[in-house]
Amino acid sequence: MFLIRKFEERDVPDCAMCFYESFFDCPLTENDKAFLRDYAQVLAEKCSFTYVAESEGQVVGFIIGHYKKDFDKALAKLHDVKPHYKAWFRCFFKFAFGGYKMSAPFKAQFDVFYKKLKENGKDTPLACDCELMALCSRRDYRKGLGTALWNAFRKRCEESGVKTVRVFTDTDATYTFYEKRGFKFVWEKPYSFGMLGKSLVYEIKLNRG
């Protein structure tokens, strides 16, 4: 059983490790961990809402959603947690100018992750009411965790009047998770940076009573 609740600032270190274990497998230095903490904080604060899953007092997963302006401008401007804009700028400039001094193995893996992320461009069909921005978990807690987080995400969307949710993912990620929960394939595009694989967009339409 997992306790699902709203994200709090104290959850940043645990969320950073969830993010790491979802996408990377190389050893980490303290500099790598510092970057992951800043990245997780910015990701959670820039979006509309984040839910975390707790197991025995430890955060072992999180899900993030962002309302689109075309759906509701007021909702799109709101954040469940207070944004720390100085932290955002610090993260951006340290990353851009190599200030984190990341280890070579982690930097190599993150560079590939970032290239995939940048495939989300102007031609990506993400017009929807709410975008599912991230779903991450610790490796040892995945059975039932994604479903529990998705159920909380879906309930939040339905209560907000959301009719459509879309997610940008890729063939290297667990896109089958979304298919099993009713998401339908919308779009695909081969990677543009020479690596085998495709970017994907999935959509689900929510039924509101």
Predicted regions: what they are:
Residues 70-130, 134, 193-196:
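Conserved acyl-donor/pantetheine-binding loop and adjacent beta-alpha core of acyl/acetyltransferases
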Residues 142-155, 180:
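Conserved acetyl-CoA-binding loop-helix of GNAT-fold acetyltransferases
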Residues 28-50, 55, 64:
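Active-site rim helix/loop that mediates acceptor-substrate recognition in acyltransferases
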Residues 128-129, 157-170:
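Conserved GNAT acetyl-CoA-binding A-motif
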Residues 133-138, 166-176, 191-195:
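Conserved beta-strand-loop-alpha-helix junction that forms the acyl-donor binding cleft
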Residues 52, 58-67, 118, 131-136:
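Conserved beta-strand in the GNAT
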Residues 115-118, 147, 159, 171-188:
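Conserved active-site alpha-helix within GNAT-family acetyltransferase domains
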Residues 2-17, 67:
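A short beta-loop-alpha structural element at the N-terminal edge
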